[in-house]
Regions:
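Conserved MFS/SLC helix-loop-helix module at the cytosolic interface between two early adjacent transmembrane helices
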Residues: 66-102
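Helix-to-loop junctions at the C-terminal end of transmembrane segments
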Residues: 67-79, 265-278, 362
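Residue-level signature of mid-helix packing/kink "hotspots" within the transmembrane helices
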Residues: 34, 61-69, 153-154, 259-263, ...
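Helix-loop boundary and gating motifs at the non-cytosolic
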Residues: 12-61, 216-222, 226-254
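Structural signature of the two symmetry-related core transmembrane helices
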Residues: 82-96, 280-295
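Helix-loop junctions at membrane interfaces in 12-TM secondary transporters
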Residues: 99-110, 297-308
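Cytoplasmic helix-loop-helix junction between adjacent transmembrane helices
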Residues: 110-149
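Juxtamembrane intracellular "pre-TM" segments in multi-pass secondary transporters
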Residues: 2-16, 191-221, 412
């Protein structure tokens, strides 16, 4: 039976081969993220203090923050493929350097370098996916990209635990090896994507152009506030679970539900979310995330905690693929990498502030934190939601501008000073 609305399977089949290669490389890279989850354990077993380990992890965060801006610039100037390969080969070297570091200053420097080089590829990957996929398929493409990302994280730690029993060196070697493999795949099989001619690039001009895009600034502002909420999952949420009397293992099991839901449910959910204006879906997702976290103020049992996770994960699945696709629609083709880098930068910045905010409020009163999460999510939704009739013209809809979007995508590739992505 023929239908106007394409099925999920048909949309996946319509994705170009390079997109699937990018998904494969992303899965391999995230599967091989062996060192960071075990870094605290590795350092403390070598005689370093928890404060030392925290300093090293903070150095990684600072490096990743810098990578968001630099990676977007490189993606638009030297090209997506070269940026991905540069990132993967550099982080492989950084991991081997970290494995041989013995003093705390050397370890901190190596982890900073790993954060910088390891996160350079993200804006380039997101921008390359937008280059390859026309607007009507972008929500599906970014959902598939996130599925590969989360599936790698889901299966990687078990392998890392096995390698750690054979010696921590194998964690570093495995991490470096999978990164280098993704780098080789990028050079051999990925297209270079769009990139700006060198004479067109300029940090000040780029910043001025992005700062003049009010729609994009609203997206960044809303994303920062919702990131402050969502990132409680890796800090205060664990304290909340153990405060209720559950063991740390229970936190791990409850949290694993988030990854399982994303891997198996996010792609099918795009069949629904892609039918609506993107800003409405982003706002709805923000409200669901806020509801899931704010309900922790009432959660006292394991089923209640599971319900909270399901609700905020549903919000994550609704908003994340739509957000990436929407930013790709907003971005001029010659600034696509920098737009993606700026979006990544908001999350990196929130990663610095979210634990501080969460810990302070949790120390005052846990309920105050969870209610604040609901308020911040509501604020993010208000910032992003369209008030004017017809959506205010905030970029192309995933369903309403298919033919127009396709011609816009092709025109952008021809007229923006960019090269053909193939």
């Amino acid at each position: 039976m023929n239908t106007i609305e394409p099925t999920l399977l048909s949309r996946l089949r319509a994705l170009p081969r390079p997109a699937w290669i990018l998904f494969l490389g992303t899965f391999l890279n995230k599967f091989g993220t062996f060192v960071l989850p075990f870094l605290t354990l590795y350092l403390t077993q070598r005689g370093f203090t928890l404060n030392d380990a925290g300093l090293a992890i903070s150095a990684y965060g600072v490096g990743s923050l810098m990578a968001s801006a630099l990676g977007g610039h490189l993606a638009d100037t030297i090209g997506r493929r070269k940026t991905i390969a540069l990132s993967m080969f550099s982080v492989a070297a950084a991991m081997m350097l970290l494995s041989q570091s013995r003093s705390l200053p050397a370890i901190v420097a190596a982890t900073w370098l790993a954060g910088l080089t390891g996160e350079l590829y993200r804006p380039a990957s997101s921008a390359l996916l937008a280059d390859l996929v026309p607007p009507e398929l972008r929500v599906t493409a970014y959902a598939a990209y996130r599925m590969a990302f989360n599936a790698g994280f889901a299966f990687g730690p078990a392998t890392a635990g096995f390698l750690a029993t054979r010696g921590y060196f194998w964690l570093f070697a495995g991490d470096a090896g999978t990164s280098a493999l993704f780098g080789l795949i990028a050079l051999a099989a990925l297209p270079r994507g769009l990139h700006t001619r060198r004479e067109e690039g300029g940090w000040s001009d780029d910043v001025k152009e992005m700062a003049g895009d009010g729609k994009f600034l609203r997206v960044l502002c809303g994303a920062f506030f919702i990131a402050l909420v969502f990132l409680q999952i890796s800090s205060t949420f664990s304290l909340h679970v153990t405060r209720l009397g559950f063991p740390a293992a229970a936190y791990g099991l409850i949290l694993s539900l988030n990854g399982v839901l994303v891997v198996f449910c996010e792609l099918p959910l795009t069949s629904l979310t892609r039918r609506f204006p993107p800003r409405l879906m982003m706002a709805a997702g923000y409200l669901l995330i806020g509801a899931g976290f704010s309900l922790n103020a009432l959660a006292r049992s394991a089923p209640a905690l599971v319900a909270c996770v399901v609700i905020f994960t549903l919000g994550e699945m609704v908003t994340m693929p739509v957000s990436s696709a929407y930013i790709a629609d907003l971005a001029p083709a010659h600034l696509r990498g920098r737009y993606m880098g700026a979006y990544s930068l908001t999350w990196s910045a929130a990663l610095i502030f979210a634990p501080q905010m969460g810990m302070r409020l949790f120390g005052v009163a846990p309920a105050a934190l969870w209610l604040a999460c609901g308020a911040l999510a509501a604020l993010a939704a208000i910032i992003i939601v369209p008030f004017s009739r017809g959506g205010g013209g905030y970029g192309p809809s995933d369903t309403c501008t298919r033919s127009a979007g396709r011609s816009h995508w092709a025109k952008a590739a021809r007229t923006s000073g960019a090269v053909n992505p193939k």
